[in-house]
């Protein structure tokens, strides 16, 4: 910041004088000590020190905001007041509203989907009476039910095959016949 050619702040410099531009030279300083290479055990200590510094700064910031908030005066009411401008209604609209009010209050019905309830015995930590639901009311009302219809007479009804022979279960011995002797080929059809 030059004060001009004459050394006075109030006057403008004469037109013949050319202002000298500022020049910045960046030169490495040879006498500066290079930083020591980080030692293996020192990195953790430096990181811990940095974290403690950040923690102290955050603590200081929070406390300063808390003090600033406590010192500032607060409004009389805890919440801001909101004023709405309501347009003036015409008498015809007021009569319509009165007719609606005379008919009765509005009723809103809320419909909730049923949900499965877990067994209350496993969730309750204290002894509580367990009241099972009545047999006439299922837990879920709109759950699809399985209906068993009698088989049509067109299909031939087969009997359920017998259980596997002992030889199929690995219990073959001298007194147990093999599976081929146990089953009769005609009984399976």
From Swiss-Prot:
Pfam families: DUF4587 (PF15248). InterPro entries: DUF4587, PRR29-like. Residues 152-189 are annotated as: Disordered. It comes from the Eukaryota. This is Proline-rich protein 29.
């Amino acid at each position: 910041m030059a004060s001009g050619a004459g050394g006075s702040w109030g006057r403008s410099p004469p037109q013949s004088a050319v202002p000298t531009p500022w020049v910045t030279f960046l030169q490495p300083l040879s006498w500066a000590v290079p930083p020591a290479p980080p030692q293996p055990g020192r990195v953790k200590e430096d990181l811990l020190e940095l974290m403690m510094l950040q923690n102290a700064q955050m603590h200081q910031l929070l406390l300063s905001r808390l003090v600033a908030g406590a010192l500032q005066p607060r409004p009389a009411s805890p919440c801001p007041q909101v004023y709405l401008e309501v347009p003036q209604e015409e008498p015809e609209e007021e009569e319509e509203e009165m007719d609606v009010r005379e008919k009765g209050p509005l009723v809103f019905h809320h419909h909730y989907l049923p949900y499965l309830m877990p067994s209350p015995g496993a969730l309750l930590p204290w002894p509580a009476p367990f009241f099972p639901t009545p047999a006439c009311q299922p837990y879920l009302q709109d759950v699809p039910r399985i209906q068993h219809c009698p088989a049509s007479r067109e299909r031939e009804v087969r009997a359920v095959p017998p259980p596997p022979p002992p030889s199929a279960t690995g219990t073959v011995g001298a007194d147990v016949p093999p599976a081929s002797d146990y089953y009769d080929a005609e009984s399976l059809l």
